[in-house]
Amino acid sequence: GKEIETTLNNQTFTPFKGGKKHARDSKIVKDIETALRQAGLKSGINPSFHHQLRNGDYVVNNAIEAVNNLGVKDIRLAQTALFNVHEPLIDYIKDGVITRIEGSVNGVVGDFISTQNPLKAPVILRSHGGRWAAVKSGELHPDIAIIAASSADARGNATGLLGKSAFGNIAYSPVDAWHADKVIIVTDNITSYPCPFREIYEGLVDYVVEMDQIGRVIGKMAAR
């Protein structure tokens, strides 16, 4: 066959050898603490989460524990919703790790906040659509979006439709992935590339974290 020039106008190009011939760099890091550190976690920022695992979610608690372990305080929690499973957050509120919240708050965390007034600013309660609009408009800016996915590949293509912890589509996080400074995918099922039914695209993702289980898919307190 004919030799193809790979250098043109002082630029070097890689010849096309087929759709799956070139290796892709993995974005998998050791754990959520490593991902947060590399993403530039610092005091005063806004980490965001979705609530699709509802009262079975493990990702929010795991991530905020990592925030605490890194010695970071004064964060604004920008989740779509909290449930009884997030009761451990009460201690982080008391310790000043979480000082502001924007999003729906249910169950024991809501009871604690409404009766004890422990935050330095009033909670801003947002409907799911209202939160989407706030992120899109810039009124609420997620510095680091932490997105639970039931399956993802090493490049960050992710879905909630496959895997042992499948919970349905990742309905409330695409807007976070589009606008956040850094995006972390947290999954308990790493798939081959490309992840089927991807809802979050690899070009938006900075880090991928694999944990043993992202949550329990249960129905109680499962209001969307």
Predicted stretch roles:
Residues G1-R224:
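Conserved alpha/beta enzyme-core scaffold
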